[in-house]
Amino acid sequence: MTVWQAIVLGIVQGLTEPLPVSSSAHLALTPYFLGWSDPGLAFDVALHFGTLLALIWYFRREWLEMIASAWRIARTRRVETVHDRRVLYLIAATIPGGIGGLLLNDLAETTFRSPVVIATSLIVMGILLWAVDRWSARARVLEEVTLRDAIIVGCAQVLALVPGVSRSGSTMTAGRLLKLDRPSVARFSFLMSMPITLAAVIVKMPDAVREHGASLPLLAGVAAAAVSSWFAISVLLRYVARHSFGVFAVYRVLLGIVVFATLASRT
């Protein structure tokens, strides 16, 4: 893999990971359409390290508050504040994704990366995102998230193991179904993505280093993912404060149709 290819894939990862359009689908489809060799799931996960850095920096105040809350809970054995509850809810939301990742890891690396699976997932989740977002009332904010909400959204995160579903797409759809407003569901989705992304990076980064080495392309890809992720996070949070998820749903469906049309033309 060249430095240029790694940078392109890093930008693709960074721009699409925060958006409900499936970064894994874009990372699998980009080499397919450009005629590059598939760098594999380990490289994709390594690029997530760049996104993780962007998330940590963007939400640094929230994480500092939650770290303080976790320390307070450990000392007092009491849950008293909104931040205390959020710590417990994020832990609860992370567990289903961790279990799903362990059980479905082999399928995620092989069968799930099929263009047919990706195109189908893009279209189906796009329709679900549009329908749920359109008919869910704007009712609750982030401070009103309950343990039940966290577990349901966490279970939805498991679906993201299928490229084309999108972690952001599945969790934001679940959050809107639970009648959380768009800015709140976006922020909660980002916060809950960090522990599971960190776990995936810890597990898969050694594989990426073995396959690609601690090389300039790998480092360039991670850096490109970090910068573009920070940009995408800031743009999305401003956008959903005023607009629906409709544009992302339409994009998903159109991309899925393009993939199917391309596959048909090559057979």
Swiss-Prot record:
Catalytic activity: di-trans,octa-cis-undecaprenyl diphosphate + H2O = di-trans,octa-cis-undecaprenyl phosphate + phosphate + H(+)
One Gene Ontology term, aspect cellular component: plasma membrane
Membrane topology: Multi-pass membrane protein
EC class (word): hydrolase
EC annotation from Swiss-Prot or TrEMBL: 3.6.1.27
TM spans (from-to): 39-59, 87-107, 112-132, 145-165, 183-203, 216-236, 244-264
GO molecular function, one term: undecaprenyl-diphosphatase activity
Location, primary (coarse class): membrane
Domain of life: Bacteria
Gene Ontology biological process terms, A to Z: cell wall organization; peptidoglycan biosynthetic process; regulation of cell shape; response to antibiotic
Location of this chain's protein in the cell: Cell inner membrane
Record keywords: Antibiotic resistance, Cell inner membrane, Cell membrane, Cell shape, Cell wall biogenesis/degradation, Hydrolase, Membrane, Peptidoglycan synthesis, Transmembrane, Transmembrane helix
Record's function text: Catalyzes the dephosphorylation of undecaprenyl diphosphate (UPP). Confers resistance to bacitracin.
PANTHER family assigned: UNDECAPRENYL-DIPHOSPHATASE
Extra information: Bacitracin is thought to be involved in the inhibition of peptidoglycan synthesis by sequestering undecaprenyl diphosphate, thereby reducing the pool of lipid carrier available.
Alphabetical list of NCBIfam families matching this protein: undec_PP_bacA (TIGR00753)
Family: Belongs to the UppP family.
This protein's name: Undecaprenyl-diphosphatase
Organism (species): Gemmatimonas aurantiaca (strain DSM 14586 / JCM 11422 / NBRC 100505 / T-27)
